[in-house]
Amino acid sequence: MRAYHPTPATKTRALWREIGLPASRGTVLVDSIKMGFSVDVIDSIHLWASIPKAEILRATGIPSRSLTRRRTHDGRFTPEESERIARFVRVMDAAVDLFGGDKGKAITWMSTPIKGLGHRSPDSLLETETGALEVCDLIGRLEHGVFS
């Protein structure tokens, strides 16, 4: 019997790579969150998704004044704000996967009220971890054909 030797996953998901984040999970992401993401990540998400920056900030619960302050101070978000951004990207990435890589359909779906979410749009629930988990749970059910 051969011994199992795990190798670290090196493949970074396309969305995470496109917006300049080092990894979609693992200790590299944890370290990046602790250090604080660059404020430029909001611009990168905006360019990738064509979502207005104000909508990204609303969905992440980060006031626009905080973004302005961070830009003039040290150019980095706090770890808490970085965690919120990672949550947004994680859910957006799952939505893009749900739609077979079609980010246009995923973005439209994210802003559409969904019966399975109490007639709320997925992006309106991302400000809290519990809301994001509900969205990810729904995505998982849709991927596996479980509609209850």
From Swiss-Prot:
Q: Which domain of life does the protein's organism represent?
A: Bacteria
- Which InterPro entries does its entry note? Antitox_Xre, Xre-like_HTH, Xre/MbcA/ParS-like_toxin-bd
Recorded GO MF terms: DNA binding
Key words, A-Z: Toxin-antitoxin system
**Keyword set includes rRNA processing:** no
Q: Which Pfam families match?
A: Xre-like-HTH, Xre_MbcA_ParS_C
Summarizing the function annotation, the protein's role is: Antitoxin component of a type II toxin-antitoxin (TA) system. Neutralizes the activity of cognate toxin Res.
Task: Describe the protein's quaternary organization and the partners it interacts with.
Answer: Homodimer. Forms a complex with cognate toxin Rse.
Which family is annotated?
Answer: Belongs to the MbcA/ParS/Xre antitoxin family.
Know the name of this protein? Answer: Antitoxin Xre
